[in-house]
Amino acid sequence: MTVSRIISLAPSATATLAAAGLAERVVGVTAHCELDRPTVGGWLNPDYEGLAELSPELVCTSDSLQGEIHEELKARGYNTFHHEPSRLTDVLEGFESLPKAAGAAAAGRELRESAERRLTAVDERVEARLAEGASRPTVYCEEWSDPPMAAGNWVPDAVEAAGGRYPFVTPGERSQEVDREIIEGVDPDHAVLHICGTGSQVSVDRIHNREWAVEPAVHVFDDSLLNQPSPHLIRGIEQLSRRLYPE
């Protein structure tokens, strides 16, 4: 069944729908989403009355933090799509399953296949550089700074896909606090700041001003490029790989 009225309560779902060519079906979003649509509250505090006024045929949520919201939506009788990715493979699966839930299975397959082709291209470039004698660098990704948190979930997979090593968090596990001893013990070659909710408005001094006896190359990424389980993540992997293996 084709769904023509979708409300997205997750920025990742909004970005995925847009990338699949379904933006015109989205009639409502949160204040954190990219599409210019009527807003129905925030990520963790939806406006249920405003949502009802838009008469959605499908409401999208994401992450365990929206689990209770998802259950409330079901209790109110809404048709829902809920996705809780923890690995890169889960993110790719969502590229296909979300459009399918909206009645656009072909668009979902193409979106996933396109992402997989892009990841293959990254892998081939990395393998070529390694064959030329390049070393696989160690990367530290920080999604929060107070206290410093090493990014988890799909980020370890993303770093590996970009050609890096990521010994801070096991793939699929939640982000973990790190301290000076941990960072100095690893001595990363690169540090990536992708602080939640800041976009790219972060200074490299967040690393330089700490009394860590390490000297990584520091990069600032828009937080959506690594934190958001959407097609933005694929672009983040491509950009990270180019930083790790510059021409």
Each predicted region: which residue ranges?
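N-terminal ligand-binding lobe of clamshell/alpha-beta domains
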Residues: M1-E247
